[in-house]
A protein has these predicted regions:
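Cross-family detector of peptidyl-prolyl cis-trans isomerase
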Residues: 2, 6-9, 24-182
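Sec-dependent signal peptide hydrophobic core
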Residues: 9-16
Length: 182
């Protein structure tokens, strides 16, 4: 499964490089200045759009396959976060500025556990005020103290194009099991 994921990643990179190569090609220097606010040549943008559409479609397919494999019953938010609330918790919902402590397990969509609170310690962060991934902030605001949930976080809400610089490469969706302390 790991080699399949790497192959998909390599294909995505090749598509992006192909699009970049053709998007940057110029037929000749005209000496004319172009306005930064106007798009005069739509042909230069189309390869980027097409490459991005392919990448987004493949990522969505991977997410759906993962959800089916684990038989999670998920709801999708407007941003693309998928969440299965196992226990909403008690008290007030978390909001911006609240401190959260949670146990977690973070893994790739091939099932490989990347980080977990048993080995890496609990996550302690302030909602919407820390460098935790955007998808986790969004999910926590749907829960209360003591809440538990399964999450599938698309790459744009996780570690983005660059990855985390350690164990997660760029453009990878991640899944999390979280349990918030009371």
């Amino acid at each position: 499964m790991e080699s399949k994921m790497r192959k998909i990643g390599r294909i995505s990179i090749l598509i992006a490089l192909f699009a970049l190569f053709f998007a940057c090609g110029e037929k000749g220097v005209t000496g004319k200045m172009k306005s930064a606010g106007k798009t005069e040549n739509h042909e230069k943008i189309d390869p980027f759009l097409e490459a991005n559409k392919i990448i987004v479609r493949r990522e969505a397919e991977e997410i759906e396959l993962f959800i089916k494999r684990y038989q999670w019953t998920m709801k999708e938010t407007g941003s693309g976060l998928r969440i299965e609330i196992l226990d909403v918790g008690e008290g007030d919902f978390f909001k911006e500025g609240d401190e959260v402590t949670l146990n977690f397990q973070l893994f790739l969509l091939d099932g490989e556990v990347v980080y977990d609170s048993k080995n890496d310690g609990k996550k302690v962060f302030v909602v919407d005020k820390s460098s935790e991934i955007t998808g986790l902030h969004e999910a926590v605001k749907l829960l209360k103290p003591g809440g538990k949930a399964n999450l599938v976080i698309p790459s744009h809400l996780a570690y983005g194009v660059a990855g985390d610089g350690h164990r997660i490469i760029g453009q990878k969706s991640v899944a999390m099991k979280i349990s918030i302390e009371k």
